[in-house]
Every structure is written in C-alpha cells, then in structure tokens.
C-alpha cells in the first residue's frame, strides 16, 4: 500500500489477488503516515551547513537547499503570535523548488561523498521530502497543509482521507479481508477503512471463557488538570491489587509524564519503561515476567511496545491496570483530524480520539488472556469507563464490574 514501495506484481496485475490484512485497526493511521510528507526548514539548515563545509556553497545540493529554505522563510504565516497552524495553500513556486531539491538529493546520492557525516542525514531528510512531493501531486482536498515553528517552520502535507486511498489502491483486487481483535465497533471501523455498506462484517466470539478475565472499573478523574491529585488514588489502587493478590502485573499510563509522576509516589519495587529502549533492553524488561515464579510490577505507556505484540501466557502475567481511556494527546494533527471527521463522518471526537484510545485500551487488556486456560484481572481506572459512549466501544465479551 505504501506508494514508495508499491508491489506492482500484486496491485497492478490483472489476475485474481485477495489481500489479507492483520492488525487492521492500525491501517488508517499507517496510511496517513505513508501518504504524508514534510519539509523541515531547521533540519535543512543543519544539513546545508554540513554540505557547505564538505562540498562548498557552489554545490548544486547546497543551492537547492537554499532555494527551499528561502521559500519556507517567505511563507506568509499568521501574525497572531501562534507557533503552529494550517495554511490554505502554498505558493506556486514552492512545489517547484522542492522537486528540484529532491532531484539534487538523488544526484548527490550517486556521488562518492567527500563528507561522511552527511550521508545518513541526506537519507533522513530526503525521505520526508520525497513523500511531501508525492503528496503534492495528489488531490489537495485530501490533505491539510500544516506549519510548526515560527522561526524555521516545518511544513507538512498531512493526509486526511486514508479511507479513500485504501479503497482506490485495492479496487482492482478480487477481495480484501481486514481482521483484528480490535476492529470494534464494526460500523465505525468499516467507514474508517473505506468499506461499502454491502461489505460483509463479522464479529467472532472470543475463544476464551469471559469469566476467566475479571475486569473492574474504579472512578478516578485522570484528566490532565486533575492528574496530580489522581496519583494518590492510583497508587492506592495499584498497591491494594498487588497486596491482595501478589503476582505479575503491568500498569499502563497515557503518557511518560503521568507515569513518572506516579512512579515517584509508588512505594513498591517496580520497573519503569524508558522512552528509548533497544531490543536488548526490552528483552531484559520482560525477563522478570518470563522467569518462573516471583512477582513483577512494571509501569508502561499505553500504546507502546509493551501494550501490543507481547505474549505472556499462563502465570507470566496475572493482570493489567489501565490508567485513563487512552485518548491521543491533543495537538495540531489530532485537531485537524477531528475537524476532518466532523465534516465527513459527523463525529470528530469519536473518530479522532475515542476510537484510537479505546483500541489501545483493548490491546493492553488483551495481554492478560492468551490461552484457553489463562485467568487474570484487569483494573480500569477512569470514571469515563462508566459512560455509555465508552461502554459501546468495549469488546462485547467484556464483563465490567465496579
């Protein structure tokens, strides 16, 4: 599906091909990432310095960078003092200088670089630029132009219509099957994936007995303005859980800041997820769970590497605690998406915030029961879990008590 690595023998063939997509709940966001691109003025300035020192200011790449930097600097940004926002359009010559820079990049990559440090940086800067140029060739109605940073702005062509692209990219195939444990609720997910009303939707029952997972909800106000005061109750709930039933637990937080705030007050031995963890560090982090016997308590970030894709069957994991409802951080990108979904689907908050949040919650809770014989607990700490709007986003087999 990625236009940069399009598999022509599949998508351009006339023969029968059926596409199977696992973990399809990630697809809308992945498509948006693939179709979006950016021009980073600050990054270009740093790289231009390296290129200038190594190859001289007369080098074609240096000149092409200067043209793009000048074009970004000449953009008419709002005079309200804001540090980010959207632009209705870009000047006519903006695309031309960006294409010229991409050509200069490609020519430079064919050279035997006299500068070692620039090699990797060229690739890091080139790929978003190529994506930006591809984005600008598509229908402008499918994109929003965003700017970030007033002094040296970053300009992003942000893809909005992932459903339309997915539908167009797969229309020549004989069939597409999307599946995931978190494609719920199906009507909303079908819209996000560009499905038609007559497309078949199936919700399979959980293969695991629902009584094997005890889910309890506690009313805690975890909204940003109340997080400091919420820490006291969160610490109390975690302590009560691991004291009442010692074992191996994962606790998930909506952000690293909230995680650290709670860790400072939690008087229990525990591991804390770090922002940057290589494969060896991740494996070491999970060793406490994969060893026979003993207890383990770890504080992690919801939606991170430890809330999806890890398998801890049997007594390797006794339960999880989820703090908050997983709403994405409010930022320029999410607010632009919210406005887009409000226009196209009628409920921007549901599609931009609630659905992605509850998908992360469902994935985290799904770490507990991995086989037919597993048993465990999940503790949901947020008052919004009792709201009907959030209840309908929970898997049908969940039995939540208070």
Regions from the PLM with identified roles:
Residues 349, 379-402:
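N-terminal targeting/trafficking signals and adjacent low-complexity tails
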Residues 198-203, 267-286:
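Conserved RecA-like helicase motor-core motifs
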Residues 254-262, 378-387:
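A glycine-rich phosphate-binding loop feature that marks nucleotide/adenosyl-phosphate handling sites
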Residues 27-30, 185-192, 259-261, 307-311, ...:
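Switch/connector loops and helix/strand junctions flanking conserved nucleotide-binding motifs
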Residues 219-229, 275-385:
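Conserved RecA-like P-loop NTPase helicase motor core
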Residues 191-196, 265-267, 313-317, 337-338, ...:
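Short, solvent-exposed amphipathic alpha-helical segments in soluble enzyme
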Residues 4-250, 254-266:
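Conserved coupling segment at the C-terminus of the helicase ATP-binding
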Residues 1, 21, 158, 179-181, ...:
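Short His-Asn-centered micro-motif
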């Amino acid at each position: 599906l990625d236009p940069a690595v399009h598999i022509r023998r599949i998508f351009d063939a006339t023969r029968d091909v059926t596409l199977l997509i696992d973990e399809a709940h990630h697809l809308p966001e992945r498509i948006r990432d693939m179709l979006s691109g950016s021009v980073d003025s600050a990054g270009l300035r740093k790289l231009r310095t390296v290129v200038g020192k190594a190859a001289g200011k007369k080098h074609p790449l240096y000149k092409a960078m200067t043209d793009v930097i000048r074009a970004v600097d000449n953009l008419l940004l709002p005079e309200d003092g804001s540090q980010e926002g959207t632009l209705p359009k870009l000047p006519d010559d903006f695309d031309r200088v960006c294409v010229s820079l991409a050509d200069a990049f490609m020519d430079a990559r064919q050279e035997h670089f006299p500068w070692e440090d620039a090699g990797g940086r060229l690739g890091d800067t080139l790929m978003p630029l190529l994506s930006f140029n591809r984005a600008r060739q598509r229908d402008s109605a499918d994109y929003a132009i965003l700017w970030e940073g007033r002094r040296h702005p970053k300009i992003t062509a942000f893809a909005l219509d992932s459903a339309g692209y997915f539908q167009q990219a797969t229309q020549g195939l004989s069939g597409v099957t999307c599946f995931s444990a978190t494609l719920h609720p199906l009507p909303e997910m079908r819209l996000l994936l560009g499905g038609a009303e007559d497309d078949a939707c199936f919700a399979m029952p959980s293969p695991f007995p629902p009584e094997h997972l005890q889910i309890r909800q506690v009313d805690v106000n975890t909204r940003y303005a109340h997080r400091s005061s919420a820490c006291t109750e969160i610490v109390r709930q975690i302590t009560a859980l691991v004291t009442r039933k010692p074992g191996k637990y994962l606790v998930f937080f909506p952000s690293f800041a909230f995680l650290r705030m709670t860790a400072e007050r939690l008087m229990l031995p525990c591991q804390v997820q770090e922002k940057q963890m290589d494969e060896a560090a991740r494996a070491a982090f999970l060793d406490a769970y994969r060893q026979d016997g003993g207890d383990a308590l770890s504080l992690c970030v919801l939606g991170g590497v430890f809330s999806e894709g890890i398998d801890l069957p049997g007594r390797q994991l006794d339960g999880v605690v989820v703090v908050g409802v997983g709403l994405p951080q409010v930022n320029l990108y999410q607010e632009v998406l919210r406005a887009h979904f409000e226009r196209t689907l009628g409920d921007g908050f549901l599609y931009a915030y609630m659905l992605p949040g509850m998908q992360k919650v469902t994935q985290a809770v799904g770490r507990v029961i991995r086989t037919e014989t597993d048993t465990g607990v999940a503790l949901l700490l947020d008052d919004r879990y009792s709201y009907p709007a959030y209840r309908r986003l929970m898997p049908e087999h969940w039995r939540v008590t208070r």
